[in-house]
Amino acid sequence: MVSAPGDHAGVSREGLRILPVTGLPEFRPGDDVAERIAAAAPWLADGDILVVTSKIIAKAEGRVVPAPVDPEERDAVRRALVEQEAVRVLARKGRTLITENKLGIVQAASGVDGSNVEKDELVLLPADPDASAAALRAGLAERLGVRVAVVVTDTMGRAWRNGQTDAAIGAAGLRVLHDYAGAVDGQGNELHVTQVAVADELAAAADLVKGKLRGVPVAVVRGLPTQEDGSTAADLVRAGEEDLFWLGTAEAVERGRREAVLLRRSVRTFADTPVEPDTIRAAVSVALTAPAPHHTRPVRFVWVRDAQRRQRLLAAMADKWRADLRADGLDPERIERRVGRGRILFDAPEVLIPCCVPDGAHSYPDERRQAAETTMFTVAVGAAVQGLLVALATEGVGSCWIGSTIFAPEVTRAELDLPADWNPLGAIAVGYPTEELAPRPPRDPGDGLVER
């Protein structure tokens, strides 16, 4: 990227330097971190950026937990702490958990760590790393009379990439994000969504001199101008469902399975967006996996794609309905009000008619068993209809099953040129909803579930 006005990469004339702070002791609960750093780095100057490993903050703040020395017992305690510090589990692989912790940070094991601590201890993250950064900054100003920025870091993995890097989990005294929106590069291109996580870049750069084995938990970045804007590391966290990848693959699949049926609802108002034919074909393919008696295929979905034929069918059904309602003694106003409820089938982008066909049905000499056979085939069609509605919902397509053709089977068969033994079982309006589908909570079964 060509430097633009306000580029985050500006450095002083002396260049950018990263300096280790050596000679620090092992930190224990109750230690004064500011006092120890001030003693080890009296050369700190205004404008320096102090980058501090979170572990020394956590130790000093008493976030150390006793643990057994036995490896298996120690791991059991560690896993219990991981669950304790987590608010949700995003992914798991073997014993490894990727969690969102109470700080909103997504990382392995909720930040619970057993490295660089005694073998009979485990350490948690600081309870409030931003507050810790602010307190350390104030403590150094009091002891050395300098204004420095502070970044508190922890090591994290990254999606899509091997290896780990340090990232900021606490910050004070600097702008943690640099927003390039509205800036123009050297070729005249306006930048729109580029935000640079400056605090994370500082954390990663400082780790080049801190390392993991040399006992150097603090480094100083010198020569990078900073601007204090009140932001903290909490501003780096993209929370929950705002993130495009807020669940692991297996967890996303599991959630999708749980919510698939709950996405279905009766949609009666549709957007103008056309539904791709392949989307409907795919949903029908799913629907045809529904259970059926005697290994038969008792359902056919008639897709009324010809607009004129649909108009003729719906008009003929409306006339039949009016005649039935007149025979019931309803006045014209009530009749038109009832018929008007069927406008959804005129307005829907697509309409499908589910039909029960008797292919493979058994014949019985008595009325009781023959009625049971008919019921069995009808139930199978209902299962396929539900499968279709759910399959459409999982693709973001709305639908509404309406019983209309059940009351006008002869008219439906005549207008659609269907065989005499095809029994239409309603109509399904299909189209994209005007509002995105969302799963609704399951109902309390109440008297819907009877246990014996």
UniProtKB/Swiss-Prot annotation:
A divalent metal cation 2 binds at T155. GTP binds at L24, P25, E26, F27, S54, K59, N116. The keyword Cytoplasm does not apply. Binds 2 divalent metal cations per subunit. The ions could be magnesium and/or manganese. Its EC number is 6.3.2.31, 6.3.2.34, 1.3.8.17. GO terms for molecular function: coenzyme F420-0:L-glutamate ligase activity; coenzyme F420-1:gamma-L-glutamate ligase activity; GTP binding; metal ion binding; oxidoreductase activity, acting on the CH-CH group of donors, with a flavin as acceptor. Coenzyme F420-(gamma-Glu)n binds at D324. Residues 249-452 are annotated as: Dehydro-coenzyme F420-0 reductase. PANTHER family: COENZYME F420:L-GLUTAMATE LIGASE, PTHR47917. Bifunctional enzyme that catalyzes the GTP-dependent successive addition of two or more gamma-linked L-glutamates to the L-lactyl phosphodiester of 7,8-didemethyl-8-hydroxy-5-deazariboflavin (F420-0) to form polyglutamated F420 derivatives, and the FMNH2-dependent reduction of dehydro-F420-0 to form F420-0. NCBIfam families: F420_cofE, F420_FbiB_CTERM, PRK13294.1. This is Bifunctional F420 biosynthesis protein FbiB. The lineage of its organism: Bacteria, Bacillati, Actinomycetota, Actinomycetes, Mycobacteriales.
